UniProtKB/Swiss-Prot annotation:
Origin species: Komagataella phaffii (strain ATCC 76273 / CBS 7435 / CECT 11047 / NRRL Y-11430 / Wegner 21-1) (Yeast)
Coiled coil: 512-635
InterPro entries given in the database record: BMT1, MAP7_domain-containing
Residues carrying sugar: N484
UniProt GO cellular component terms: membrane; microtubule cytoskeleton
Region annotation Disordered: where it falls in the sequence: 517-635
Keywords noted in UniProt: Cell wall biogenesis/degradation, Coiled coil, Glycoprotein, Glycosyltransferase, Membrane, Signal-anchor, Transferase, Transmembrane, Transmembrane helix
Gene behind this protein: BMT2
Recorded topology in the membrane: Single-pass type II membrane protein
Role noted for this protein: Beta-mannosyltransferase involved in cell wall biosynthesis. Initiates the beta-mannosylation of core N-linked glycans.
Positions in the Cytoplasmic compartment: 1-6
Protein name: Beta-mannosyltransferase 2
Extracellular side stretches: 28-635
């Protein structure tokens, strides 16, 4: 019996060993960052026809001039024009009723029930109180699913911009972006190798100080970035949230595949502002044990942070350039190129989509749009090699509010959230990139971009006679050309050109979508504001005059009371003096009485006179007291 049992255990161990070896063999660097080169079962695009039709999208970019012997160049010299193809957007479904039920089952959020309108049905409660946007995703080829995290907010007022709390929820979608509700994944813990059972949708267990009646609690702006753990993929969810004292907003990551390990990041020897956001995460291929962040673009500051304790060092910094705009605000997590290509030693290149925030341009007070960026590391140096102008992927961007037309609101918001996947799909080198994004703080959608790698590989920069060599993509890959002063000047010029082009884009966007109407609306709002300011000014003047009148009246009353008090004090002193004098006379008379005999009749007369004087004084005091009392009652 024991022999048979041992044989059975040996067989089971052998099978598990084979499975484990298979897992280790199938996990490779080509899958890192949601990027697969296999094109087979690991591909996110088994059926290219399911992606829909691709439409042309012209893209203008600006490339740094790396050659010192070239002349001072203008934006036209640095520009590169190419063509991409893009699909229509695909809006991602989200069963908010299902997610709401999950959230309310958690003790810390159960109090939300009391803030909902109790007269409504569940469907009506969801429509009024619950909102979702900012979905960020990565493709997991090991599981054939897209892993997406999104922000879900609850508003007692029924306004998305006035949340009571903000919650991050993880979902999975199949290759065709169908939501998988109630599904589960058996996941290998990326650091221990133990199997972890995860059911989706999944409310990420992020600590929050939910206080009934308070607002803006919880995690915001989720972004997911994929790293390679020792035993498999480890999607890290980055977010910002208030600290436990509710006084500071900091950057955190949580690892859903590693027992929800959560880390808060802190920069050593650096005074961090009260509110932190817009950090851009990326990983070095040869160092997956630390996460890097682009902390800001001006100054260009790069951090290296521990995934264990969150301590960060500033590993690269170019001082702030006052003449350079700071309109680049955050970006998607950065990923490497989709295939291994020859590159200079100790050099690495990432692609990302930062966003611009441009004020008072086109048909909106604020316009947010993505750009394309090529970010480069040479040794310990980092810099931006390429920036495009604004991209809208051919969309009529949803209005933030208003009547539904593109220029009917004060804000035009198209935010890139993450690069879900980027892979070469055929032997001809054709590539597809999937980007998740949000519009107007309302939606989560994806589009598919075809030919981005080819766009970059065909890149040509300045080729004038003064240039030693043409600045093409091959040169970017093979040369080490970082020079502190030159690189700073190059980045200033490229960013200036790209932002000028972005401003030109939003002006054109407004002209073709109702700029005249916007100007009329702005003029009306300006007049309304001026009228309100004038009324406010008049009201303030009237209030000041009334305040002055009250102060003067108060002073008069105080002066009258002061004089009356002085008069009363004088009369009191006078009475005290009379009383004292009377006491002296009485004492004198008593002494005289003791010193000599007085006729009884004379004594009686003097006593009567004394009593009469005392009576008159008392009567006078009584009348004066009655008079004062009457005057007080009259007041």
């Amino acid at each position: 019996m024991r022999t048979r049992l041992n044989f059975l255990l040996l067989c089971i161990a052998s099978v598990l060993s084979v499975i484990w070896i298979g897992v280790l063999l199938t996990w490779n660097d080509n899958n890192l960052g949601g990027i697969s080169l296999n094109g087979g079962k690991d591909s996110a695009y088994d059926d290219l026809l399911s992606l829909g039709s691709f439409n042309d999208m012209e893209v203008d970019s600006y490339v740094t001039n790396i050659y010192d012997n070239a002349p001072v160049l203008g934006c036209t010299d640095l520009s590169y024009h190419g063509l991409l193809k893009v699909t229509p957007k695909h809006d991602l479904a989200c069963d908010l009723e299902f997610i709401r039920a999950q959230i309310l089952d958690i003790d810390v959020y159960s109090a939300i029930k009391d803030l909902e309108d109790k007269a409504l049905t569940v469907k009506q409660k969801v429509e009024k109180h619950w909102f979702t946007f900012y979905g960020s995703s990565v493709f997991l080829p090991e599981h054939d699913v897209h892993y997406l995290v999104r922000r879900v907010i609850f508003s007692a007022e029924g306004k998305a911009n006035s949340p009571v709390t903000s919650i991050i929820v993880a979902q999975i979608y199949d290759k065709n972006w169908n939501e998988l509700n109630g599904h589960f994944l058996d996941i290998l813990n990326p650091n221990t190798g133990k199997v972890q059972h995860n059911t989706f949708p999944q409310v990420l267990p992020i600590a929050t100080n939910f206080v009934k009646g308070k607002k803006f609690r919880g995690a915001e702006d989720p972004r997911v970035v994929l790293r390679k753990g020792r035993f498999g993929p480890d999607p890290l969810v980055m977010f910002n949230s208030l600290t436990q004292d509710n006084k500071r907003r900091r950057i955190f990551t949580i690892s859903p595949f590693d027992q929800f390990k959560t880390v808060m990041y802190d920069i050593k020897d650096y005074e961090m502002p009260r509110y932190e956001k817009n950090w851009v995460p990326f990983f070095l291929k040869d160092n997956q044990e630390a996460v890097h962040f682009v902390y800001s673009f001006n100054p260009l500051r790069v951090l290296k942070c521990s995934l264990d304790d969150g301590s960060c060092d500033i590993v690269f910094e170019i001082p702030k350039v006052d003449s350079m705009s700071s309109e680049l605000r955050g970006a998607t997590p950065m990923i490497n190129l989709p295939q291994a290509i020859p590159m200079a030693k100790d050099k690495e290149i990432w692609v990302s989509f930062p966003r611009t925030r441009i004020a008072n341009c086109g048909c909106s007070r604020t316009t947010y749009r993505p750009m394309l960026m090529l970010f480069v590391r040479e040794g310990s140096n980092f810099f931006v090699e390429l920036l495009s102008t604004s991209l809208d992927f051919g969309l009529e961007v949803l209005p933030y509010s208003g009547n539904g037309l593109p220029c009917s609101a004060d804000h035009s918001v198209l935010i890139p959230n993450s690069i879900d996947n980027w892979e070469v799909v055929d032997s001809n080198g054709d590539d597809i990139l999937t980007l998740s994004f949000s519009e107007a703080d309302k939606s989560t959608s994806v589009i598919h971009i075809r030919g981005l790698y080819n766009y970059l590989s065909e890149l040509d920069g300045y080729q004038g006679p003064e240039a030693e060599d043409e600045h093409n993509f091959q040169r970017i890959l093979s040369d080490l050309h970082f020079d502190n002063k030159t690189t700073v000047n190059n980045f200033i010029k490229v960013q200036s050109c790209a932002l000028d082009a972005a401003k030109g884009y939003c002006k054109e966007y407004g002209l073709t979508r109702g700029e005249a109407e916007r100007r009329r609306r702005v003029a009306e709002e300006r007049k309304k504001k001026e009228k309100e300011e004038e009324e406010k000014k008049k009201k303030k003047e009237k209030e000041e005059e009334e305040k002055k009148r009250i102060e003067e009246e108060k002073k008069k009353i105080e002066e009258k009371e002061r004089k009356e008090k002085e008069k009363e004090e004088a009369e009191r002193k006078k009475l005290q003096e009379m009383k004292k004098k009377l006491e002296e006379i009485t004492e004198k008379l008593e002494k005289g009485q003791r010193n000599k005999e007085i006729d009884p009749k004379e004594k009686q007369r003097e006593e009567e006179e004394r009593k009469e004087r005392v009576r008159k004084i008392a009567e006078k005091q009584r009348k004066e007291a009655e008079k004062k009392e009457a005057e007080k009652k009259g007041k």
